[in-house]
A protein has these predicted regions:
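Asp-based, Mg2+/Mn2+-dependent phosphohydrolase catalytic module
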Residues: 142-147, 160-181
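Residue-level marker for buried hydrophobic side chains located in beta-strands
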Residues: 15, 152-153
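Active-site phosphate-binding/coordination module
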Residues: 1-64
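Short, glycine/serine-rich, charged loops/turns that create anion-binding
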Residues: 20, 81-84, 157
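A short acidic, often aromatic-flanked loop/helix-cap motif at beta-alpha or helix-coil junctions
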Residues: 21-26, 122-125, 180-181
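Residues at the C-termini of beta-strands that transition into short coil/loop
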Residues: 16-19, 119, 177
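Conserved acidic, metal-coordinating active-site core of Asp-based
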Residues: 56, 60-151, 162
Length: 181
C-alpha cells in the first residue's frame, strides 16, 4: 500500500492493495498501515508444479529463479525466470496469448490458489480469499457502502486478469484500455 501511496503523490486516500492483503489510510496527513496480511507458502509445492509446467510447455530455460516468493505470501511464476532481461519480457507475450493458452491448466494444477496472468511473462498466485472483488466488498461493508454505490476502475478484466473478479462478481466498472490518454 505504501508503494501505491507514493506513486499517487501521497494523495490522502484509503488504499486496498495486493488483492486485499494490504490496507492503509491517511490520518492527520500521515500514512497509516491498517492491515498487512501475510500467508505461509508451500514452496516445494510451487517449485514442483512450476517445473511440471516448464517441462510440458518448453519453458525449461530461464534466467534467475523459477519462482519468486514474496514476503506477504504472494507467489510469482515467471516463465522467463525472475531475472529475465526487460527487452525479452516485453516481446515474450504482449497479447498474453501464450499464458492464456495454458491458464486453465495452471489453475487446475494450483487448486486452492487464485491465479492471475500477471506482468509480461508471469502467473501470480494468492490464497483464494485474496482477490479484488472480495477486497473491495470487505472494505465497502466495513465503511457502510453497498455494491450499488461502487464504481471500480481498472484495466485487466479478462479471464485471469487482476480485475477479473470485479467483472465476475457483477460490480459496475470502467475498463481503461489506454492509460496514456
Amino acid at each position: 500500500a505504501l508503494r501505491i501511496y507514493n506513486q499517487m503523490g501521497q494523495y490522502p486516500i484509503d488504499i486496498v492493495a495486493n488483492y486485499g492483503m494490504q490496507e492503509s489510510t491517511v490520518v492527520n496527513g500521515e500514512f497509516v498501515e491498517v492491515r498487512n496480511d501475510r500467508c505461509q507458502v508451500d514452496k516445494e509445492f510451487f517449485l514442483k508444479n512450476a517445473q511440471l509446467i516448464r517441462e510440458k510447455h518448453g519453458y525449461t530455460e530461464y534466467a534467475g529463479e523459477s519462482v519468486e516468493f514474496h514476503d506477504a505470501g504472494m507467489v510469482t511464476f515467471g516463465l522467463l525466470g525472475t531475472e529475465a532481461k526487460r527487452e525479452d519480457k516485453l516481446v515474450f507475450d504482449p497479447d498474453r496469448a501464450k499464458r492464456r493458452a495454458i491458464y486453465k491448466e495452471v489453475c487446475e494444477l494450483f487448486k486452492g490458489y487464485t491465479v492471475y496472468i500477471g506482468g509480461s511473462t508471469s502467473f501470480d498466485f494468492t490464497e483464494k480469499q485474496y482477490n479484488k472483488y472480495d477486497a473491495v466488498m470487505d472494505y465497502a461493508h466495513r465503511n457502510g457502502f453497498t455494491r450499488d454505490e461502487i464504481l471500480y476502475i481498472g484495466d485487466d478484466f479478462s479471464d485471469g486478469g487482476g480485475d477479473s473478479h470485479i467483472r465476475l462478481g457483477g460490480m459496475d466498472y470502467i475498463h481503461i484500455t489506454d492509460f496514456t490518454r
